[in-house]
Structures are given as C-alpha cells and as structure tokens.
Amino acid sequence: DRYAIEASFLKNSKKRTLKGIANFGIRPTFHKNSEILEVHLFRFKLNIYNSLLKVDFVEFIRHEKKFSGVEALKKQLKSDIAKAQKILN
C-alpha cells in the first residue's frame, strides 16, 4: 500500500526546516478518493500557502486507513504525532 503516514521535514524557499507528519493518501475516513499530500507541522502558525515547499519523508509510521469517525482519527493522530516527534528530535 503506497498510502502512508510518515515523519517528515518540510523546507521552505528560505531553507528553513520544519518538523511535521505527512499523509500521502486519499483520506478514506472522509470518503475522498483523490490523492493528496497533507503535512501537519509541529508548533507552526505562519501562513505558507502558495509557497514553494519541499517535503522529505524521514520514516514510515503507518499505512493510511479508514477510521470509524473523526474522534477515532484524532486519537490516532495524537499517537502518530508523538512517534514522529521522537523520530525527528
């Protein structure tokens, strides 16, 4: 399965490196089917939309899966984020 959650570094055009967790997949919990790359950055509040960015996948965390609902997904994301933070620190 190529859809996965990965610990990742994101670099912007100013070469600033940010830590996060990336999901490449189709968001099955939300009944979507088009591929998308989403990156959740840790402790980051600035607007970087329409910026040139590079995502470096560091380590596989788990395959993407469908959850019973948003609350189950949020619970799993907390665990995923904790794993990614350990990997990236």
Could you tell me what each predicted segment is?
Residues 1-89:
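Phosphate/ribose-recognition catalytic cores of enzymes acting on nucleotide-derived substrates
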